[in-house]
Design a protein with these regions (language model features):
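N-terminal onset of structured domains
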Residues: 2, 19-56, 64-66
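Domain-scale recognition of soluble eukaryotic interaction modules
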Residues: 2-22, 70-168
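Hydrophobic residues positioned within well-ordered beta-strands of beta-sheet architectures
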Residues: 39, 56-58, 71, 123
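Residue-level recognition of well-ordered beta-strand positions that form the cores
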Residues: 42, 59-61, 74, 93
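Non-catalytic surface loops within mature trypsin-like serine protease
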Residues: 45, 62-64, 77, 96
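Amphipathic repeat-derived elements
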Residues: 50-68, 153, 160-161, 165
Length: 168
């Protein structure tokens, strides 16, 4: 098990790497300069998607045994999406700990692995925005709209994008 100091060192390194070599599509930094385990992330809505032009804020919370266990990611901006719970928590395979999948939706290779970094997590979230998974939704209503009433879904996402721009 990773000690908090190992987790701190790894998070410090990942933060330094992201500051030195920023990645298109998002920015990340500490929520509070004294706590390496809480990050503030802004994801820019990916081009050629319904989320294009949006600026979506999230908090990434790391456990003390990171990277052995995954962080949680919760949008603080409103995001209407099949894979985002009503409280903003992101539901994607790589954030699920290894082990049994009671619903049988995921391969073990799709779940959390200590090789993932802040960058790979956020890039997976950007990919999720581009390609919703409506097979195992966190937000059943959004998934139903995505499948059955795409125009209504698009209107709600447009409203989220507009609100995210107004918050700048």
């Amino acid at each position: 098990m990773a000690s908090p100091s190992q987790a701190s060192l790894l998070l410090q390194k990942q933060l330094k790497d992201l500051c030195k070599n920023p990645v298109d599509g998002f920015s990340a930094g500490l929520l509070d300069e004294t706590n390496l385990f809480e990050w503030s992330v802004t994801i820019i809505g990916p081009p050629d998607t319904l989320y294009e032009g949006g600026f979506f804020n999230a908090i990434m919370s790391f456990p003390s045994d990171y990277p052995n266990s995954p962080p949680t990611v919760r949008f603080t901006s409103e995001v209407w999406h099949p894979n985002v719970y009503a409280d903003g928590k992101v539901c994607i395979s790589i954030l699920h700990p290894p082990g049994d999948d009671p619903n049988g939706y995921e391969l073990a290779s799709e779940r959390w692995s200590p090789v993932h970094t802040v960058e790979s997590i956020v890039l997976s979230i950007i990919s999720m925005l581009s390609s919703p998974n409506d097979e195992s939704p966190a937000n059943v209503e959004a998934a139903k709209e995505w499948r059955e009433r795409r125009d209504d879904f698009k209107k709600k996402v447009s409203r989220c994008v507009r609100r995210s721009q107004e918050m700048l």
